[in-house]
C-alpha cells in the first residue's frame, strides 16, 4: 500500500484548522457539544463582565476578569482546533480521493455484447443498468459488474497498491470501481449504481462528512458528561449564597472559573476529535468504514470468523512430502514428479521442483534440451505431465489418475489409496504421480499456515476474543488446520447458511461478531455480522452488505481492524479517566483561593502553596486550557495499544491515566503559578 500518510501536524492543515476553529465559535456550532457550550457561555459572560467593569458599570478587577475571559476563549478555541484538525486530516484524505474522479465520456452499448453499436455519452449520464465498453487506457466510468471480457486494471488511485489486478466476468472478481483505469484488453460492464452513488462518492462523503453521526458509546459518554456538568453547575450555583451568608460573597468571575475547571472540559473538548481520528486511522490502514458506529463496534468485538484460505494460511499450496507406493523408492517418485512439473509455472508446480531439489539434489532440467513434450493441465483431463524418451509421466487428482491408469490396463494400488486418505486427513491435498500405467506414489500439497498467526491468536485470546476458522474442508482436515493455527473453534464444510446460523448463534449469546467476505454468497452473513469487512476485489453485493471495505482485499486485515477499534475505545476511556481525575487538583487550587477570606480554615487545603487567590484561580484556568493542546496528539494518534485482558487493561489505564490525571495538574498548576509570580502577574 503506497498511499501517502499525512504527518500529524502538516503546516497547511494547521493553518486551515486554526481558521476553522474560529468559525466554530458560532453558538450553533457550540451547541452540538453541551460541555463546551457551557464554557462558551461562560466566556461570553466574563467578556460582558469585563466590558461592564471597564466602563464602570459594575465594581471589580477588569484586568483579572479580562484575563480569565481570554483563557476561557482559548479553552473553546483549543477544543475547536482539536476537532478541526481531526476533520482537516480526513478532508485531506478525501481530497486525494477526489483527484481520482475525472470527467470522461463512456461508450454506452445498445446491447450487452462487446461488438454491439455504441454511443459516446458523458459518464455523468450513465444510469444503473446501462452497459458500457471500456478499452485499454480508458477510465472505468461507473461501478459495476463485468459481464464479458477480462482485463488488467490499475486500481492504485483507490487502493494505493501499484500492482495491477485482473478483473473478468464470472466468479468473485467481476466487480469494478469507477475511477480505476484499464491497462490491457477490454471489459463490458453493467453499471450497478446511479451518478453520485458510486463507491468513490460514498468514500468521499463518509471521509469528509462534517456532520458525523455520534456512536452509541459516544452518546452514552456525552450523557454522562452532561450529567456531571449539571451537577457541578448546581454545586457552583449554591456557593454564592453560601459565601454571601459568611459575609464575603465570591465574585461571579471566580464562580465561573471554578465551574469551567470542574466540568470535564478535557474529554469534552477532545471527544469529537477522537471519533474523527478513529475513522481517519482506519482509512490510513486502507479500510473504508461506512460510519463511526462500525469502527466502535470493531473495538467491542469478541468473536472473529476467519476464512482459512488466505487469512490463516498463505492460500497457495506447497509440496511438503513425497510418499512412494509399495516397491517404489522415494527418489524415483521425486524424479518423476519433478520431470512432470518442469514446465508447470503454477506455485504448486514450482514447489514440487524445489522440494525434489532440496530432498535429493535433483537439478532442474530444461524441457527443450530434453526433447520432451509438456502436457498442460486442462479442466477436462485434470492432469499435467511430460512425454520424454518413451516415458509418459503424469500427475493429477486421484480420480483423474485412476481413470488414466485403468484406461491403460493398470490398477490403482490399495496402499496408495490409503496414503491418499492419510494425506487428506492431515489437511493436505494429494496429487498422484504415474508413469505409463504404474502408480509411483503421492505428492502431499499443503496450504502453509502463516508465520506468527498462532501467536496473534494467542494475543487475541488474552483480550477475550474468540477465533473461529471457517473452511469448506472436511472435518478431519479442518481439525488438523485448527490445531496447527491455534484457533479456538472451527466450522467445517461451511455453507453460506451455516455461516449465517453461526453468527446468529453467537449474537444470541450476547457476543459481537466480525467477519470478512468477498463473494455474493457471503452477503447474507456480512449483513448479519456486527463488523463486516468486504474485500474491494469482491462482488458489489458483498461490498453493499458490509459496513467496511478493505481496499487491499487482505482478509488478515480483520485483526488490524479490531485493534484500531479497540484503540479508539481505549483512547476515549483513558482521556475520560484523565479528565475526571484532573478535577481533584483543580479543587485544591480554586476552593481555598475562593473561600479563604470567608473561611480561613480552608487555607489548609492550599497544599500546593500557591502565591495568591488570584494566581491560584488563573493558574487553574490556564492549565485547563493548555492541557487540551497537549493532549491533541494523543487524541489523534490514539493511546498505546497492548493486547491485554479487559481487567489488565483497566488496571494499566487507571495507573497511567488515573494517577497521571491526579499528579499532572498539581505539577502543572504549580509551575504556572510560579511563572505568573516571576512575571509579576500574580
Curated annotation (Swiss-Prot):
Cite the GO molecular-function annotations of the record.
ATP binding; ATP hydrolysis activity; magnesium ion binding; P-type potassium transmembrane transporter activity
Record key words, sorted: ATP-binding, Cell inner membrane, Cell membrane, Ion transport, Magnesium, Membrane, Metal-binding, Nucleotide-binding, Phosphoprotein, Potassium, Potassium transport, Translocase, Transmembrane, Transmembrane helix, Transport
* Transmembrane feature ranges: 34-54, 58-78, 219-239, 254-274, 588-608, 616-636, 662-682
Broad class of enzyme this protein falls into: translocase
Q: What is this protein called?
A: Potassium-transporting ATPase ATP-binding subunit
Membrane topology designation: Multi-pass membrane protein
The UniProt entry lists the main location of this chain as membrane
Q: Where does Mg(2+) bind?
A: 518, 522
Where does the chain bind ATP?
A: 344, 348, 377-384, 395
Q: Where in the cell is it found?
A: Cell inner membrane
| InterPro entries reported in the protein's UniProt record | ATPase_P-typ_cyto_dom_N, ATPase_P-typ_P_site, ATPase_P-typ_TM_dom_sf, ATPase_P-typ_transduc_dom_A_sf, HAD-like_sf, HAD_sf, P-type_ATPase_bsu_IA, P_typ_ATPase
- HAMAP family with a match to the protein in the record: KdpB (MF_00285)
Pfam families from the entry?
E1-E2_ATPase, Hydrolase
The uppermost taxa in this organism's lineage are:
Bacteria, Pseudomonadati, Pseudomonadota, Gammaproteobacteria, Enterobacterales
Q: How does the record describe its quaternary structure?
A: The system is composed of three essential subunits: KdpA, KdpB and KdpC.
Please report the organism this UniProt entry assigns to the protein: Salmonella choleraesuis (strain SC-B67)
Amino acid at each position: 500500500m503506497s498511499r501517502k500518510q499525512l504527518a500529524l501536524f502538516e503546516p497547511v492543515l494547521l493553518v486551515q484548522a486554526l481558521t476553522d476553529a474560529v468559525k466554530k465559535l458560532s453558538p450553533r456550532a457550540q451547541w452540538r457539544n453541551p460541555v463546551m457550550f457551557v464554557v462558551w457561555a461562560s466566556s461570553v459572560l466574563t467578556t460582558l463582565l469585563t466590558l461592564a467593569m471597564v466602563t464602570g458599570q459594575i465594581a471589580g478587577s477588569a484586568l483579572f476578569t479580562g484575563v480569565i475571559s481570554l483563557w476561557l476563549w482559548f479553552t473553546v478555541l483549543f477544543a475547536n482546533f482539536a476537532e478541526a484538525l481531526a476533520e482537516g486530516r480526513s478532508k485531506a484524505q478525501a481530497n486525494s480521493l477526489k483527484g481520482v474522479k475525472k470527467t470522461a465520456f463512456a461508450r454506452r452499448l445498445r446491447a450487452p455484447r462487446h461488438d454491439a453499436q455504441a454511443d459516446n455519452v458523458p459518464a455523468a449520464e450513465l444510469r444503473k443498468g446501462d452497459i458500457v465498453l471500456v478499452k485499454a487506457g480508458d477510465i472505468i466510468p461507473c461501478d459495476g459488474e463485468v459481464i464479458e471480457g477480462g482485463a488488467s486494471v490499475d486500481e492504485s488511485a483507490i487502493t494505493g497498491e501499484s500492482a495491477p489486478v485482473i478483473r473478468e466476468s464470472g466468479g468473485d472478481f467481476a466487480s469494478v470501481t469507477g475511477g480505476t483505469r484499464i491497462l490491457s484488453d477490454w471489459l463490458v460492464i453493467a453499471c450497478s449504481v446511479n451518478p453520485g452513488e458510486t463507491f468513490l462518492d460514498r468514500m468521499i462523503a463518509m471521509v469528509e462528512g462534517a456532520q458525523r453521526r455520534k456512536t452509541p458509546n459516544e452518546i452514552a459518554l456525552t450523557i454522562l458528561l452532561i450529567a456531571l456538568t449539571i451537577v457541578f453547575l448546581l454545586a457552583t450555583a449554591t456557593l454564592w449564597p453560601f459565601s454571601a451568608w459568611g459575609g464575603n460573597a465570591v465574585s461571579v468571575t471566580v464562580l465561573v472559573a471554578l465551574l469551567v475547571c470542574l466540568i470535564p472540559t478535557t474529554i469534552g473538548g477532545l471527544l469529537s476529535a477522537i471519533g474523527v481520528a478513529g475513522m481517519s486511522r482506519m482509512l490510513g490502514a486502507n479500510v473504508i468504514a461506512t460510519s463511526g458506529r462500525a469502527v466502535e463496534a470493531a473495538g467491542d468485538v469478541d468473536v472473529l470468523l476467519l476464512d482459512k484460505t488466505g487469512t490463516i494460511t498463505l492460500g497457495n499450496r506447497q509440496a511438503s512430502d513425497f510418499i512412494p507406493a509399495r516397491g517404489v523408492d522415494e527418489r524415483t517418485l521425486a524424479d518423476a514428479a519433478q520431470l512432470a512439473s518442469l514446465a508447470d509455472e503454477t506455485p504448486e508446480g514450482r514447489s514440487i521442483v524445489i522440494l525434489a531439489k532440496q530432498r535429493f539434489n535433483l537439478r532442474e532440467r530444461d524441457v527443450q534440451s530434453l526433447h520432451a513434450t509438456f502436457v498442460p493441465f486442462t479442466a477436462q483431463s485434470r492432469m499435467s505431465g511430460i512425454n520424454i524418451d518413451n516415458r509418459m509421466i503424469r500427475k493429477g487428482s486421484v480420480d483423474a489418475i485412476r481413470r488414466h491408469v485403468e484406461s491403460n490396463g493398470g490398477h490403482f494400488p490399495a496402499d496408495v489409496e490409503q496414503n491418499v486418505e492419510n494425506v487428506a486427513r492431515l489437511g493436505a491435498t494429494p496429487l498422484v504421480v504415474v508413469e505409463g500405467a504404474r502408480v509411483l506414489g503421492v505428492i502431499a500439497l499443503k496450504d502453509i499456515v502463516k508465520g506468527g498467526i498462532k501467536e496473534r491468536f494467542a494475543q487475541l485470546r488474552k483480550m477475550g476474543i474468540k477465533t473461529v476458522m471457517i473452511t469448506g474442508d472436511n472435518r478431519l482436515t479442518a481439525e488438523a488446520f485448527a490445531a496447527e493455527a491455534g484457533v479456538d473453534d472451527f466450522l467445517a464444510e461451511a455453507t453460506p447458511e451455516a455461516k449465517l446460523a453461526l453468527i446468529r448463534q453467537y449474537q444470541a449469546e450476547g457476543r459481537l461478531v466480525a467477519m470478512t467476505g468477498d463473494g455474493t454468497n457471503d452477503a447474507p452473513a456480512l449483513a448479519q455480522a456486527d463488523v463486516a469487512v468486504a474485500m474491494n476485489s469482491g462482488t458489489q453485493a458483498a461490498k453493499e452488505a458490509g459496513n467496511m471495505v478493505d481496499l487491499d482485499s487482505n482478509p488478515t486485515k480483520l485483526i488490524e481492524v479490531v485493534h484500531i477499534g479497540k484503540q479508539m475505545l481505549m483512547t476515549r476511556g483513558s482521556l475520560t479517566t484523565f479528565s475526571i481525575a484532573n478535577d481533584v487538583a483543580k479543587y485544591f487550587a480554586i476552593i481555598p483561593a475562593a473561600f479563604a477570606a470567608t473561611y480561613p480554615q480552608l487555607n489548609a487545603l492550599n497544599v500546593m502553596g500557591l502565591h495568591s487567590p488570584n494566581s491560584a484561580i488563573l493558574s487553574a484556568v490556564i492549565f485547563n486550557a493548555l492541557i487540551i493542546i497537549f493532549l491533541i496528539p494523543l487524541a489523534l494518534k490514539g493511546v498505546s495499544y497492548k493486547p491485554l485482558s479487559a481487567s489488565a487493561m483497566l488496571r494499566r489505564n487507571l495507573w497511567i491515566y488515573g494517577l497521571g490525571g491526579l499528579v499532572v495538574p498539581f505539577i502543572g498548576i504549580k509551575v504556572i503559578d510560579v511563572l505568573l509570580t516571576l512575571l509579576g502577574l500574580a
